[in-house]
Regions:
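Substrate-binding cleft of secreted/luminal carbohydrate-active enzymes
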Residues: 230-300
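N-terminal regions that are enriched for targeting/export leaders
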Residues: 18-60
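Sec-dependent N-terminal signal peptides
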Residues: 3-13
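Metal-dependent polysaccharide deacetylase catalytic core of the NodB/CE4 family, i.e.
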Residues: 60-144, 246-253, 278-281, 285-294
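Active-site-adjacent pocket scaffolds in enzyme catalytic domains
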Residues: 122-247, 295-304
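Alpha-helical scaffolding within the catalytic cores
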Residues: 45-51, 74-94, 115, 189-192, ...
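Positively charged n-region of N-terminal signal peptides that target proteins for export
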Residues: 1-4, 394-395
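C-terminal outer-membrane/trafficking sorting elements
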Residues: 314-395
């Protein structure tokens, strides 16, 4: 059975407790030749040891997703002398077996396709992962396409090795210009109909939420503002209470070699951990989240886009605002009865944000003449709380 997933969840935010967010760190190492250099590899190895120890001590989770070039370096550079610092194990076996880091294949598939990378992980002595660590969702991924893996596939470099994943995460596009930013779990139909759930397909998508990336060009304060936005959206009821929210925090493994970058990762980890300690979030690897979704949530298909809001809101504090004319042919006036600047947000029937502006006092005009007719929702908020909510009709 194929069907579109219902995303217009109706609920009262006051009546239902909101779920916890499942945070997880996610790292990639790319196909770049820097991993061929032994000094670079060894410097990174020390950073991995330090970070894995820190995450384990503080109960934080990490999915490390590796491509072929780095894995070959692990196979060729892990000497007996080097492994003395990691319980006489390779760095990846130690991270997984001793520190609880999940290991998944990640493939650009320019030479090694996903089964080949899975074979390299197996050669290192790691257990088989059933997670595809990212792929182009709406087109080919290098020389391959994700639909080839639905029923399993043999490798190109290792033609006798067969691998069938259960899940794929993310939903990328070339150069990451228009990646999917969704929460939830569903079985995509194909590259052209990725958001349509197909219960006959084996391969399941794990949505990893909004795009939150740690980079040297992105400030700590901006990263944490993104984290705060996700937490607030779930806890305030903007996102459905029956949803399952996995939010990954991404970084490039090679960037750990820079001390300032490494320290930024630690700072973000500590700040996110404050939400965990407050009881509104938890740390979960992708496998842990998937298992919880299957068992506790009964594998209920769910799909929610980052920034989308629930279609039902509470019409409150009408004495604080007058909205007219209703219905309207395109121009809406918002008269505020209270002083001070507030944030006005307007959403369409699908819960998508279509207008955002600052307003103050009476006579605030919103020109919606280019928008299609239908029911629209508005929300007023200050820095501390939502002050008014309601709806209006465009003809």
């Amino acid at each position: 059975m194929k069907h579109h997933i219902l995303t217009l969840c109706l609920f009262s935010v006051q009546a239902i407790a909101q779920p916890k967010i499942h945070f997880d760190f996610l790292s990639h190492n790319e196909e770049s030749s820097q991993w061929n250099g032994t000094p670079y590899y060894n410097t990174n190895r020390l950073k991995l040891i330090s970070l894995a120890n820190y995450f384990q001590t503080n109960g934080m989770t990490w999915n490390m997703q590796s491509d072929w070039r780095y894995l070959i370096s692990v196979l060729t550079k892990e000497t007996a002398a080097l492994m003395q610092s990691t319980n006489n194990k390779s760095i990846l076996r130690w991270m997984h077996e001793d520190k609880g880091v999940e290991m998944d294949p990640h493939a650009h598939e320019s030479q090694y396709i996903y089964p080949d990378v899975a074979k390299l992980l197996d050669s290192i002595g790691l257990p088989e992962s059933k997670v595809m660590g990212g792929s182009i969702y709406n087109d080919s991924n290098g020389v391959n396409v994700w639909t080839n893996l639905v029923n399993g596939q043999y490798g190109l470099v290792f033609p006798n090795y067969f691998w069938q994943p259960d899940c794929m995460m993310g939903g990328g596009t070339p150069n990451h210009v228009n990646d999917l930013k969704y929460f939830g779990f569903w079985n995509p139909q194909d590259t052209a109909n990725y958001l349509i759930h197909d219960s006959t397909s084996h391969l399941r998508h794990i949505g990893v939420g909004c795009e939150i990336k740690i980079k040297d060009t992105i400030s700590f304060s901006f990263i944490m503002s993104q984290v705060n936005d996700v937490v607030n959206a779930v806890q305030s009821g903007q996102y459905p209470s029956n949803g399952f929210y996995v939010q990954t925090i991404f970084f490039e493994q090679g960037d750990l070699n820079d001390t300032a970058f490494y320290n930024k990762v630690i700072a973000v980890a500590d700040s996110v951990n404050a939400f965990v300690m407050a009881g509104v979030a938890q740390w979960s690897t992708l496998k842990q989240s998937y298992t919880e979704w299957e068992t506790i949530y009964n594998a209920q298909v769910f799909q929610w886009e980052c920034g989308q809001m629930s279609i039902k809101i509470n019409e409150t504090a009408s004495q604080l605002i007058t909205v007219y004319p209703v219905p309207s042919s395109g121009k809406i006036i918002f008269d505020l009865k209270s002083s001070g600047v507030q944030e006005l947000e307007v959403y369409n029937q699908e819960g998508k944000l279509v207008l955002q502006k600052q307003v103050s006092g009476p006579g605030n005009e919103a020109d919606l003449r280019s928008f299609p007719g239908g029911i629209y929702l508005y929300r007023l908020s200050n820095h501390e709380e939502i002050t008014a909510e309601g709806k209006f009709i465009l003809e």
